[in-house]
Amino acid sequence: MWFVYALGSAVFAALTSILAKIGIEGVNSTLATAIRTAVVLLMSWGMVFLTGTQTGIAEISRRSWLFLVLSGLATGASWLCYYHALQVGAASKVVPVDKLSVVITLALAFVVLHEPFTAKSLIGCALITAGTLFRVL
């Protein structure tokens, strides 16, 4: 089932890039990011209340809170950079560079989370990097 959700994420991320590029025209990128974030906030809390999972807030550990907040800060920084890049660059070039996050995530998963880094992972990272460079240079 994880694959279905991951594929859905990829489809929606692709739509996000195109919709954002169209919507950001003539709008300050920081303001556009704030508007997008407000929509995401409303949608996320709507899902929490729709599914009745708001009661789980009290059970979240301090460690989880810390890393969720850090993740939120990283997301905010990512979105601010992404929207500015989209505003000044072509979506067909910005998006592939943004997707280098896959390579960075695999490296961090290996170093921080001690996940296995196989020959298959290395080849995949090399292909993603080469494809990105081929596309944007």
Predicted regions and their residues:
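Membrane-interface interhelical linkers
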Residues: 1-8, 27, 40-68, 79-88, ...
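Glycine-/small-residue-enriched transmembrane alpha-helix faces in small-molecule transporters
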Residues: 1-31
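Hydrophobic residues within membrane-embedded alpha-helical segments of Major Facilitator Superfamily
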Residues: 5, 12, 19, 74-77, ...
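Hydrophobic/aromatic residues within transmembrane alpha-helices
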Residues: 23, 32, 85, 111-113, ...
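Helix-helix packing/entry segments at the starts of transmembrane helices
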Residues: 31-38, 80, 86-106
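Hydrophobic transmembrane alpha-helices of multi-pass small-molecule transport proteins
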Residues: 44, 120-136
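C-terminal transmembrane-helix exit sites in multi-pass transporters
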Residues: 103-122
